[in-house]
Amino acid sequence: MELGRIGVWWSGSWRAAGDADHNVAGELESLGYGTLWSSGGFDPGLSSRFGRLLDATERATVASGIVSVWTAAPADVGPAVADLEARSGGRFLLGLGASHSSLVPGYARPYAHVVEYLDALDALDPPVPPERRILAALGPRMLELAAARAAGAHPYFVPVEHTARAREVLGRGPLLAPEVAVVLETDRTRALELARQYAAIYLPAPNYTNNLRRFGYGDADIEGGGSDRLIEAVIPWGDADAIARRVHEHLTAGADHVCVQVVAGFEKFPLDEYRALAPALLGD
């Protein structure tokens, strides 16, 4: 499956009425972004959400980043994936993840639950084959599972050091597609303010903080909204050229594809920012 080097990570919170999804997706494709990632989260329905994005595009891959294995039953996901694949000529990639204990009642044995979920996808008729699915993965065991049972890994909220480590664990071949949030803002104070608004969603989650600790970030970095050191490592900011340099560091470190999520507040989808970033991100 061809993802291109740079894609867009599109929060499910931007689900809009009418033709808004359709128009935005079509323009992002026309700008040259190779894959449109949208969070599936806790919505059990795949066909309507991702079908709109596929119908709005002609070439771009559309990927779920991610669908929770706790809320979307394999028996429902399998037919939905088959439908999306058929209507798009094979342009849909199923992203799956174990979510977080704070969001899932009865959360237990997440690794084992993901394994069981993949077993169930394999047992469907037709199955969802490994090459059509990708796993949200941070730690070594989930990365190894992503290499063995899926097309690869889709890490989220990570510094570039994680991308390098993930490539070592995955080895050559499996897909590595990290999400990288960015702030298109040259004023450092304002950029860090926006970055912290975004980080506040994720710093309370042990999955993310435990992963950051593997790379030398301690309590002083994680508490209080995140230290400048941590925030700037995970969330690049600056003008388009500065952001492109930081995004391309992930490609140099071993990523095959980077999903760029523009952080610009919560008022509207940041289409203007994606337009401004496209020449620097997508140019040779």
Task: Please name every model-derived segment.
Residues 1-284:
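Active-site-adjacent structural elements that line small-molecule/cofactor binding pockets in enzymes
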